[in-house]
UniProtKB/Swiss-Prot annotation:
Motif AIM2 boundaries: 151-154
Cellular compartment(s): Cytoplasm; Endosome; Early endosome
Gene: tollip
Record text about domains: Both ATG8-interaction motifs (AIM1 and AIM2) are required for the association with ATG8 family proteins.
Name of the protein in its database record: Toll-interacting protein
C2 domain mapped to chain residues: 35-152
Subunit structure of this chain's protein: Interacts with ATG8 family proteins (via AIM motifs), and ubiquitin (via CUE domain). Found in a complex with TOM1; interacts (via N-terminus) with TOM1 (via GAT domain); the interactions leads to TOM1-recruitment to endosomes and inhibition of TOLLIP binding to PtdIns(3)P.
One Pfam family recorded for the sequence: C2
Superkingdom in the source lineage: Eukaryota
Role description: Component of the signaling pathway of IL-1 and Toll-like receptors. Inhibits cell activation by microbial products. Connects the ubiquitin pathway to autophagy by functioning as a ubiquitin-ATG8 family adapter and thus mediating autophagic clearance of ubiquitin conjugates. The TOLLIP-dependent selective autophagy pathway plays an important role in clearance of cytotoxic polyQ proteins aggregates. In a complex with TOM1, recruits ubiquitin-conjugated proteins onto early endosomes. Binds to phosphatidylinositol 3-phosphate (PtdIns(3)P).
Length: 269
């Protein structure tokens, strides 16, 4: 039991303090708010198996309506998908017919079904000039294992869908995504002590069994086939077969994507 003594600064407690010293008892409404917040967090982070997609976009070339450069135009593409931004190399002096042949691997978060594409003219002494743009919905046929090779209209200063067209080759792969398993809140039983703070209801955890992501199934179409290597070797007779094999494996057996990657390697060399 605490006792009180007098000092020059007034009375002070010494010894054991009472149980309710500097404690604020939460009201029923405050406890309910805390439980609601914990329940909302549990719903947000429910440990379910989600699915994310990996989209392969090959930015092949564009046919633009006008050359906006003073002497030359050096276009490059920028793609915004979700919160991620991807860019192609600059097609130096590409003018109205730039070619990139750039393969971009994008991760599609759940709920995202489109991306935004812009074409800029790279400037040396001023801000890069945006010359064309378009909003592209990801085709549903990609999820059926098909490839899409299409020309998409571009908008710009000439008007909507009047700035030219851009050629894109797209393919899609499903990727399992594991979200963290959160404990389940059963009931508040413990109070966290603190000076001047409302005690926080402590949950009882039911961790459950840890979830393990199943190994991804091997798609026979993604296995490296000798006929694919021979086909690409005929297109690149001077290329080392082992280089072709490694690029093909890196592209998951996608022959078109491997060809685009090798084209980019040849251009960069």
């Amino acid at each position: 039991m605490a006792t009180s003594i007098s000092t020059q600064r007034g009375q002070v407690f010494i010894g054991e303090l009472p149980q309710d010293f500097l404690r604020i008892t939460p009201t029923q409404q405050q406890q309910q708010i805390q439980l609601d917040a914990q329940a909302a967090q549990q719903l947000q982070y429910s440990g379910v198996m989600g699915t994310m997609g990996r989209l392969s976009i090959t930015v092949v070339q564009a046919k633009l309506a006008k050359n906006y450069g003073m002497t030359r135009m050096d276009p490059y593409c920028r793609i915004r998908l979700g919160y991620a931004v991807y860019e192609t190399p600059t097609a130096h002096n590409g003018a109205k017919n730039p070619r990139w042949n750039k393969v971009i691997q994008c991760t599609i978060p759940p709920g995202v079904d489109s991306f935004y594409l812009e074409i800029f003219d790279e400037r040396a002494f001023s801000m890069d000039d945006r010359i064309a743009w378009t909003h592209i919905t990801i085709p549903e046929t990609l999820k059926e294992g098909k490839h899409v090779d299409e020309w998409f209209s571009l908008s710009g200063r000439q008007g909507d869908d009047k700035e030219g067209m851009i050629n894109l080759v797209m393919s899609y792969t499903s990727v399992p995504a594991m979200m963290p398993q959160q404990p389940v809140v059963l009931m508040p039983t413990v109070y966290q002590q603190g000076v001047g703070y409302v005690p926080i209801a402590g949950p009882i955890y039911n961790p459950g069994m840890p979830m393990a992501a199943p190994p991804p199934a091997v798609n026979p179409q993604h296995q490296t086939r000798e006929e694919d290597i021979k086909f690409i070797k005929d297109m690149f007779p001077t290329m080392d077969p082992e280089v072709i094999r490694s690029v093909l494996e890196a592209q998951g057996g996608n022959r078109d994507a491997a060809v685009n990657s090798l084209l980019q390697m040849v251009e960069d060399s």
